[in-house]
């Protein structure tokens, strides 16, 4: 495959053009008066959004060098979204400002490596200053404020604050589409996992299509159950207590399932069988969590326990279990609080030691189900386009609120970055190109507040000069045009989001500045690749 190669200024300027085209599309969304961007979908309705990373993902440029530049900036938005869940537009604007100022200095003869070093030192100092400025989230109102700013809607912010208040720091907040109009918050006490009843014959509430069992025994098995003779001794013991039975296992099939269903239909014995969530080692771990939460044991031959010899004291208990076709909720398990606390501590240690983002996410879910709870925000809207846009905003706002709880809050509206730079640069002792690199950061930190001002119809330079002379935490309320105490007014950003945006932008800027050559596909090969992808998708029926 033939390639094109560009060197020096030509290479860097090609990358910069791609970055500018992407950043210019993203930055119009920043601030309370930011605009939306409409994204065309090849299949289905267009999407309307103000989310930086969603816009960035959709941008594909024709020019090969520009495409690479855009991809590098996409990485800034994606990384910030992965780490903090929000702040993608701010990260993109910072990256653009750092690269623009940096390339200007490289063209004037500055050493790119010296500039990169100066940028890294300055960003580290500003990040430290942001951490010092951060105030711990103490009230539900502060969570509501930060979520409201992210979502652009105070009703959404209030609902998210209520959800986090109910489930706690470790809890799970999920967003689901609803057939009804408006917003609804559904709270779950205890543990919920994504597996429902094996057979609809287990349903006890026909209207709601749920199996609701009060004060049941819970049998937790790390294998399939097929032979009724293995299960019969335990069934007889449970029937003598007149309590219902919940079976959570890899699967229940054959005559064992038939026996349970027949007894349920006849009214002889109430039970429900549920498939265990997860696969392999993760399934074992989740079954262990359920056992500890309910005060039972996992019946497994690995630990010398056989189903046919299982006694009642090896079964778990809960106040109530609700099973739908898709999920199971365990309410108020009877586990020992000390054992649950020990399990929570163990999972936290595993999270700290894990190198995999996927493993960390799954461990976090397990932790939330044990230590917190589950809140589901159900979203409804008049049209599918509006529904998707609203759901996306709420998901961003949930991430934003969680980040605020994690590392605290700073003044919003781009003010925290600007004011952190004033203090950070007082103590900076650099010279030559490193000092120039630090100055590039100082100028770039003005970019977010200037863009917010511009999107609000104000002059950015005037706003920056005014904010520089205000007390820490005071700045422009772009929604009203007034200069106020931003934290007191509820115009706040999570420190984690602001810090991540700056650090990721600086990382990519350093790569831009130290690039001396770009190797790219020739246009005809790029078009052929795109055509091949289209043909492959058509052949699959897309």
Curated annotation (Swiss-Prot):
| UniProt xrefs under InterPro entries | Chaperonin_Cpn60_CS, Cpn60/GroEL, Cpn60/GroEL/TCP-1, GroEL-like_apical_dom_sf, GROEL-like_equatorial_sf, TCP-1-like_intermed_sf
Its assembly, as annotated, is:
Forms a cylinder of 14 subunits composed of two heptameric rings stacked back-to-back. Interacts with the co-chaperonin GroES.
The organism's taxonomy opens as: Bacteria, Bacillati, Actinomycetota, Actinomycetes, Frankiales
- Sites where the protein binds ATP: 29-32, 86-90, 413, 477-479, 493
Q: What are the subcellular locations of this protein?
A: Cytoplasm
Q: Which family does it belong to?
A: Belongs to the chaperonin (HSP60) family.
State the function annotated in the UniProt record: Together with its co-chaperonin GroES, plays an essential role in assisting protein folding. The GroEL-GroES system forms a nano-cage that allows encapsulation of the non-native substrate proteins and provides a physical environment optimized to promote and accelerate protein folding.
Which cellular component terms (GO) are annotated to the entry? cytoplasm
| Catalytic function, reaction form | ATP + H2O + a folded polypeptide = ADP + phosphate + an unfolded polypeptide
> Recorded E.C. number(s)?
5.6.1.7
Gene Ontology terms: biological process: protein refolding
Output this protein's name.
Chaperonin GroEL 3
> Could you state a single Gene Ontology molecular function term?
ATP-dependent protein folding chaperone
Which keywords, in A-to-Z order, does the entry hold?
ATP-binding, Chaperone, Cytoplasm, Isomerase, Nucleotide-binding
């Amino acid at each position: 495959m033939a390639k094109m190669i560009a060197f020096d200024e030509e290479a860097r300027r090609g990358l910069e053009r791609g970055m500018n085209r992407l950043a210019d599309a993203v930055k119009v969304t920043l601030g309370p008066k930011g605009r939306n961007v409409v994204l065309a979908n090849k299949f289905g309705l267009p999407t309307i959004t103000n989310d930086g990373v969603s816009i960035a993902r959709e941008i594909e440029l024709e020019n090969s060098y520009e495409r690479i530049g855009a991809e590098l900036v996409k990485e800034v938005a994606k990384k910030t979204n992965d780490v903090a869940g929000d702040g993608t537009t701010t990260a993109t604007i910072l990256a653009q400002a750092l690269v623009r100022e940096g390339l200007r200095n490289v063209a004037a003869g500055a050493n790119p490596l010296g500039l990169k070093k100066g940028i890294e030192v300055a960003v580290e100092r500003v990040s430290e200053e942001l951490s010092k400025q951060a105030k711990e989230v103490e009230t539900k109102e502060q969570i509501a404020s930060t979520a409201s700013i992210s979502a652009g809607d105070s009703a959404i912010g209030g609902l998210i604050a209520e959800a986090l208040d109910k489930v706690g720091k470790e809890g799970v907040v999920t967003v689901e589409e609803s057939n009804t109009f408006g917003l609804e918050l559904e709270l779950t006490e205890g543990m919920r996992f994504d597996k429902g009843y094996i057979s609809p014959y287990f349903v006890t509430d026909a209207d709601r299509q749920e199996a609701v069992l009060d004060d049941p025994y819970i049998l937790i098995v790390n294998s399939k159950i097929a032979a009724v003779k293995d299960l019969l001794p335990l069934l007889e013991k449970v029937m003598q207590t007149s309590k219902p039975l919940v079976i959570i296992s890899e699967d229940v099939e054959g005559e064992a399932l038939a026996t349970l269903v027949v007894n349920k239909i006849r009214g002889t014995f109430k039970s429900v069988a549920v498939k265990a969530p997860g696969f392999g080692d993760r399934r074992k771990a989740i079954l262990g969590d359920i056992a500890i939460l309910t005060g039972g044991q996992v019946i497994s031959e690995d630990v010398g326990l056989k189903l046919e010899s299982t006694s009642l004291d090896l079964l778990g208990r809960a106040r109530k279990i609700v099973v739908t076709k898709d999920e199971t909720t365990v309410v108020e398990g009877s586990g020992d609080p000390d054992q649950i606390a020990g399990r929570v501590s163990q999972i936290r240690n595993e999270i700290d030691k894990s190198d995999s983002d996927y493993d960390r996410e799954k461990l976090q879910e397990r932790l939330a189900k044990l230590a917190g709870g589950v809140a589901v925000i159900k979203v409804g809207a008049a049209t599918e386009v509006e529904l998707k846009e609203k759901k996306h905003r709420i998901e961003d706002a949930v991430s934003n609120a969680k980040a605020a709880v994690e590392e605290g809050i700073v003044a919003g509206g781009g003010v925290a970055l600007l004011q952190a730079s004033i203090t950070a640069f007082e103590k900076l002792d650099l010279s030559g190109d490193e000092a120039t690199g630090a100055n590039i950061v100082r100028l770039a930190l003005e970019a977010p507040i200037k863009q917010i001002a511009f999107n609000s119809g104000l002059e950015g330079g005037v706003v920056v000069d005014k904010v520089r002379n205000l007390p820490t935490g005071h700045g422009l309320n772009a929604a009203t045009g007034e200069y106020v105490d931003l934290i007191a007014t509820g115009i706040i950003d999570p420190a984690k989001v602001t810090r991540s945006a700056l650090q990721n932008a600086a990382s990519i800027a350093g790569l831009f500045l130290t690039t001396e050559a770009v190797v790219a596909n020739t246009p005809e090969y790029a078009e052929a690749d795109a055509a091949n992808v289209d043909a492959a998708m058509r052949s699959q029926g897309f």
